[in-house]
């Protein structure tokens, strides 16, 4: 049954959903990597699709920017459409000099300055972590493709334009591999409703060096990340 933000019916979504931030990126993933694709959502332009990858039913849908937005879509997919696994696929910024442009980062955990998980967890700190089997399957899928993926902590920020750049020094000291805006929220929703989640990011820019990937480079490295995510689903079956 349709929700306020998703105009689909039970069965329209697979039990596994890949979620980029950009709905147009979701469309690209569906058209490039899936077969027998059909659109299952268009509310507020947040496009969702379901198809098959090597015979396995998989869905892909955008989640927008930031923890509040992604939390809405993740919650509705889980509680109203029976989704059991969510894989966020997106970009991140690097703060450490040993993390390079175009690196693939598998988010084992996610720190955050958001209060959303504290609200969920009665004002206590919540350790926002990915599902171990999903982390392992993604790492194995990357290795099979010859990609040296990094595995570790992300930082999910509420602000894209941070007023306090000294926080990047703290992140580097604590070994944060990438800064993005959603992983901690998705992990929190997954924990609340007893399902599994993972975030895989590609480093699109380096906060220290101000390096940025070109549009063509982003497309190539993004495709590597999507293939890792899709192959990890097969490994998890």
Swiss-Prot record:
Name of this protein: Purine nucleoside phosphorylase DeoD-type
Active site: 205 (proton donor)
Pfam entry (one): PNP_UDP_1
Quaternary structure note: Homohexamer; trimer of homodimers.
Enzyme Commission designation: 2.4.2.1
Record-annotated site: Important for catalytic activity: 218
Species in which this protein is naturally found: Edwardsiella ictaluri (strain 93-146)
Binding residues for phosphate: 21, 25, 44, 88-91
Gene of this entry: deoD
Single biological process term from Gene Ontology: purine nucleoside catabolic process
């Amino acid at each position: 049954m349709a929700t306020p933000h998703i105009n689909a019916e039970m069965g329209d979504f697979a039990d596994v959903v890949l979620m980029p931030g950009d709905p147009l990126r979701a469309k690209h993933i569906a058209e490039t990597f899936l077969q027998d694709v059909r659109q299952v959502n268009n509310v507020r332009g947040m496009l969702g699709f379901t198809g098959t990858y090597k015979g396995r039913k998989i869905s892909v849908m955008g989640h927008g920017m930031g923890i509040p937005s992604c939390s809405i879509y993740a919650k509705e997919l889980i509680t109203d459409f029976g989704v059991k696994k969510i894989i966020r696929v997106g970009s991140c910024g690097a703060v450490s000099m040993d993390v390079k442009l175009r690196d693939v980062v598998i988010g084992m955990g996610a720190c955050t300055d958001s209060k959303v998980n504290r609200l969920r967890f009665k004002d206590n700190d919540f350790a926002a972590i990915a599902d171990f089997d999903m982390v392992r399957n993604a790492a194995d899928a990357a290795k099979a493709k010859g990609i040296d993926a990094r595995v570790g902590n992300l930082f999910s920020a509420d602000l894209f334009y941070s007023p306090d750049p000294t926080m990047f020094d703290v992140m580097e000291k604590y070994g944060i591999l990438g800064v993005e805006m959603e992983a901690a929220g998705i992990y929190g929703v997954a924990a609340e409703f007893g399902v599994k989640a993972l975030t895989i990011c590609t480093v699109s820019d380096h906060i220290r060096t101000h390096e940025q990937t070109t549009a063509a480079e982003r497309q190539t490295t993004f495709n590597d990340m999507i293939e890792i995510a899709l192959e990890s689903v097969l490994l998890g079956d």
